[in-house]
Amino acid sequence: MAIPATQMRPGMIIKHNGELHAVFSVEHRTPGNLRAFIQAKLRNLRSGAMFEHRFRSPDPIERVIVDEIPMEFLYNDGDDYYFMNTENFEQTHLKRDTLGDAVEYLTANLQITVSFFDGVAVGIELPQTVELTVVETEPGLKSATASSVTKPATLETGLVVQVPPFINEGEKIRVDTAEGAYLSRA
């Protein structure tokens, strides 16, 4: 099934140059007077090699049909991440290198979709947004309002995002999983 490059998301499985690749990160860039393009970080599922590729916005991307099974993230143990099938309660574990940047959004009991190709788990698809708790940031300013000023905040998963100055430690925020950006308070 062909989709435009602009609809590519982290966690998708695509066919590129005749081989299966997992999409790890996607960045839509629009440099000055030039045409917009999509900079994607891909991992070859056969060899495990990581590389970046630049797609033009209208380029058709062949999304591979995989078995998508709804699962719930349970916990991680080092580089192993454990998921439970919500239909039959079977557990599956995936390695950190299979998950890529998606590990920065995984919290206990998060409902996700795990993709299987030929019976082997090849990646996950995250929800559009996740709610994460701020564990470290600079103190908030009194009477701070939303503006173009931001500060870095470390979230419970280790992800660092730029947040407005009124966000304090311990607050839950909503983060966009495609961009890795702050959206709002939860």
UniProtKB/Swiss-Prot annotation:
GO function term, MF aspect, one: translation elongation factor activity
GO biological process: peptide biosynthetic process
Pathway: Protein biosynthesis; polypeptide chain elongation
Pfam family, one: EFP_N
Gene Ontology CC: cytoplasm
Keyword set includes Protein biosynthesis: yes
Record key words, sorted: Cytoplasm, Elongation factor, Protein biosynthesis
Family: Belongs to the elongation factor P family.
The protein, known as: Elongation factor P
GN (gene name): efp
